Amino acid sequence: MLSVQNLEVVYQDVILVLRGVSFEIPKGKIVSLLGSNGSGKTTVIRSITGLLDIQNGDITKGTISVDGEDITNFNPSKIVEKGIAQVLEGRRIFSELTVVENLRLGGHTNSQDIQSNIEKVLDMFPILKQRSKGEAGYLSGGEQQMLAIGRALMSDPSYLLLDEPSLGLAPKLVDQIADLIKEINEQGVTVLLVEQNANMALNVSDHGYIMETGNIVMDNPSEVLLKDEDVREFYLGLNPEGTKRKSFKDVKHYKRKKRWLS
């Protein structure tokens, strides 16, 4: 299990971004983390994978543990060794390198199995296999996202953290990515899916958490969230005709769960 407990994060020594965030990702499950821009989703992932330094961020309170071991403030390479891999928002592939070269870079912590893992990833993504010797920058957006996911899988992770994998993709490609996430999970990889596309995320995941302004404001099994009136209105755009969309801050009739310690 990957567990985040009472996490607080501050940027630039003054900006409190996460305010006591707590959630769990049971082994073998897909958990979605939903929220609008600025809610703190990406900061959560950066905290787990040790990338807060990029934005001068610090964990000031709370713990992150994987399978019972505290990994709070571990460096990124050590976290990868613990079986955690991240796919960054916006794909972030090396466009001037070939598909195979991108994959090879993802396997540097598992060098003994690089070639066999490359073959395994290319078998999973036939379109990448066809273009394995071509420069990654010439791939389509969907193909680049597949490459980014494949590169993360090169380290044989137990936990895969996906940051906005549907961003900028056409609906048909979003469906393909959703099917791919399910396939990866069926192979034994536990998944944290960070998304603004609530419909896709909740249809893929087992459990969902909703963030606003650095807090977890709601969590439930995904099938329950899909039927929740407030989730349907605010995240799925299914509000009654002619009414204004509201913030969860203004919602009074659902039960918020306080997820941080007093």
What is each of the regions a protein language model found here?
Residues L2-S262:
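Glycine-rich phosphate-binding loops of nucleotide-dependent enzymes
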